[in-house]
């Protein structure tokens, strides 16, 4: 049914009362008075809902850790209506068949809209599924992925021809092998995967003749080059001096406090392009003993709420959060989300800046919600709208899984 959503929308860099009409899940008009039409009033400050371009929801193959139902439910509770899932499953998503099998398992289970990456090995661009939202390259080994040592020029040309964005796990394998050692705490893990491995990867990625490339989860402000830079809340807010144990073990590692604080300063100064969660859950057994614990931190539900608390404290400008967590991520992939604009999906989140809470891991919706952010200040959205449908109402989930698969080029086809 056509209707207008009415409230104080974040529009052109400020909050203003607007009546936003929606037809078939898409914004049709933006007015002060929408006229004779059914209205739904949204409380608080109304922002476009967010996009997280970097999650690991573990479907298929490791659903004891997470599945798309629990992962996507966590996403919408955190104000995120589109997630992009990584390809490092037990059976890596390297070709059409693996991609189709994964999509078949996920369809009908996701609460948020979703897109899927394929893994780039340096020689497989001809056989990856054309619906892949992008390609992921692991320059250094990580969970379920060996390091890809190089992308030949001919492969880069093919990637450009197919129009793929490439996102890099930016730790160079040769450097990681050089520094490999036993680690029994966060400090030792940091030293075993030092910043120099990211710097080496940055030099390589910057040299590649790729039209669209992203360096994932940058952990130090010195890591820069001819690419977009993604940053995560855990590298912004946590460091290796905190008593987090294996819950804080992640790749790239949490850095020392000085590096973490400089990274946060760079982010709040507007020096980064993308804010993602790198949501990567593991079982209690996987995290039991630090030396053998698997790397990964959950964060899809807390990514935006943690940053909203920084906005309230006047540490972070809302516009920086808006650009990095909401507007820019979908725009990189040609997806019409993240703006209050005609022709964009009607995805909104309502924020009550007076309702700040402590993160309580027992109330998170991930399958195994042990969070390194437990006890930190956060502001969760009270209401979330996805394509004109209210999916979170007064902090409660009220919808069935309505998530839609978003293949590469989907929004081009709708023009």
Curated annotation (Swiss-Prot):
Keywords: Hydrolase, Metal-binding, Pyrimidine biosynthesis, Zinc. Zn(2+) 1 binds at residues 54, 56, 136, 278. It catalyses: (S)-dihydroorotate + H2O = N-carbamoyl-L-aspartate + H(+). InterPro entries: Amidohydro-rel, DHOase, DHOase/Allantoinase_Hydrolase, Dihydroorotase_CS, Metal-dep_hydrolase_composite, Metal_Hydrolase. The active site is at residue 278. Its EC number is 3.5.2.3. GO terms for molecular function: allantoinase activity; dihydroorotase activity; zinc ion binding. Gene3D superfamilies: Metal-dependent hydrolases, Urease, subunit C, domain 1. Binds 2 Zn(2+) ions per subunit. The modification N6-carboxylysine is found at residue 136. GO terms for cellular component: cytoplasm. Belongs to the metallo-dependent hydrolases superfamily. DHOase family. Class I DHOase subfamily. Catalyzes the reversible cyclization of carbamoyl aspartate to dihydroorotate. This is Dihydroorotase. It comes from Thermoplasma volcanium (strain ATCC 51530 / DSM 4299 / JCM 9571 / NBRC 15438 / GSS1). The lineage of its organism: Archaea, Methanobacteriati, Thermoplasmatota, Thermoplasmata, Thermoplasmatales. The gene is pyrC.
